Amino acid sequence: MAETTGRIPLWLIGTVTGIPVIGLVGIFFYGSYSGLGSSL
């Protein structure tokens, strides 16, 4: 883990893991706001 962290920039890991999380949270809030989240 230490070797891969040294080669791969930390901001790149944060971006790759952050975008899907933000997308899922956005879809979740959008669905609940539209009223579709309650049915799920």
Swiss-Prot record:
The gene is psbJ. One of the components of the core complex of photosystem II (PSII). PSII is a light-driven water:plastoquinone oxidoreductase that uses light energy to abstract electrons from H(2)O, generating O(2) and a proton gradient subsequently used for ATP formation. It consists of a core antenna complex that captures photons, and an electron transfer chain that converts photonic excitation into a charge separation. Pfam families: PsbJ. Keywords: Chloroplast, Membrane, Photosynthesis, Photosystem II, Plastid, Reaction center, Thylakoid, Transmembrane, Transmembrane helix. It is found in: Plastid, Chloroplast thylakoid membrane. The chain crosses the membrane at residues 8-28. Belongs to the PsbJ family. PSII is composed of 1 copy each of membrane proteins PsbA, PsbB, PsbC, PsbD, PsbE, PsbF, PsbH, PsbI, PsbJ, PsbK, PsbL, PsbM, PsbT, PsbX, PsbY, PsbZ, Psb30/Ycf12, at least 3 peripheral proteins of the oxygen-evolving complex and a large number of cofactors. It forms dimeric complexes. It is a single-pass membrane protein. InterPro entries: PSII_PsbJ, PSII_PsbJ_sf. GO terms for biological process: photosynthesis. This is Photosystem II reaction center protein J. HAMAP family: PSII_PsbJ. One of its GO terms (cellular component) is chloroplast thylakoid membrane. The keyword Heme does not apply.
